[in-house]
A protein has these predicted regions:
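Conserved, well-structured interaction surfaces
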Residues: 92-99, 110-125, 185
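Sec-dependent signal peptide cleavage junction
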Residues: 23-41
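Acidic/aromatic-lined carbohydrate-recognition and catalytic surfaces
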Residues: 119-128, 147-154, 188, 195
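Bacterial Sec-dependent N-terminal signal peptides
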Residues: 1-14
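Low-complexity, Ser/Thr/Pro/Gly-enriched N-terminal "stalk/linker" regions
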Residues: 37-99, 103, 133-184, 188, ...
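Well-ordered alpha-helical scaffold segments within catalytic/enzyme domains
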Residues: 42, 55-58, 63, 105-122, ...
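A conserved hydrophobic secondary-structure block that centers on an alpha-helix together
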Residues: 177-178, 182-224
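Hydrophobic core
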Residues: 15-25
Length: 224
């Protein structure tokens, strides 16, 4: 798939802003809705909105393969020395937080499960799978197993407040003191459950047996 430059980045933001404008206008009353009727069609291109909204994740990819994996040509490899490579930055910083990542991945996967035909018809399935597979690859790399039992898992990579104090591109953030990996063997059951949910729905959607194996192990960890 062709990489996208700054122009597409601007268009993605514009599409999101247009949709926000449409939603906000709808709340302001029937009179305003009537005045918008003539131009509403120009905003309600939900096929394009779906496509552009997924570019958000290309912009937030982390790892030693970002240069080839991201759809944006202005993104490149970063944080290649992380103890757990890959995944996605949290929005607005360079930390990889487990809870929002797990929730996001499971929500993306469930959206595809519910509306598979729409993704297929719009040609967006391959992009969606690339994103959910990347999330799930990170969750599996973050999980240490003994047989089918989780012995420990990583629930965060990066130091929250210290990272928030640094303003730079991820490609130029080379201070390894900011890239601590946090592991646990008997805590963070909520995060383990989110990982499990994301892996389970990705297995349902795309059939990777390893996703199911890790989903079961993390689920069992989360309820023990």
């Amino acid at each position: 798939m062709k990489k996208l430059g700054l122009g597409k980045r601007v268009l993605a933001c514009a599409a999101s802003a247009a949709t926000l404008l449409t939603g906000t206008t709808a709340l302001s009353g029937l009179t305003t809705l009537g005045s918008m009727a003539a131009s509403a069609a120009s905003y309600d291109n939900y096929a394009k909105l779906l496509q552009y909204s997924m570019y958000f994740y290309d912009g937030n990819m982390c790892g030693s393969d970002v240069g080839s994996a991201s759809q944006f040509d202005w993104r490149d490899n970063c944080h290649g020395s992380d103890e757990v490579d890959g995944g996605f930055h949290d929005a607005g910083d360079h930390v990889k937080f487990g809870l929002p990542a797990g929730y996001t991945a499971s929500t993306l996967g469930w959206g595809y499960y519910e509306f598979k035909d729409s993704y297929d018809a719009l040609g967006q399935t391959a992009h969606l799978q690339a994103l959910t597979d990347r999330f799930c690859d990170f969750f599996k790399a973050s999980t240490k197993l003994s047989g089918d039992t989780v012995t420990s898992f990583c629930y965060q990579v990066g130091v929250g407040q210290a990272d928030h104090d640094v303003w730079c591109s991820p490609e130029s953030q080379n201070d390894q003191s900011l890239r601590t990996a946090y592991w646990t063997s008997d805590d963070a059951s909520d995060i383990a459950a989110e990982y499990a949910a994301a892996l389970a729905v990705n297995y349902i959607n795309f059939g990777n047996a390893e996703d199911l194996k890790y989903a079961k192990a993390l689920y069992n960890y989360s309820i023990k």
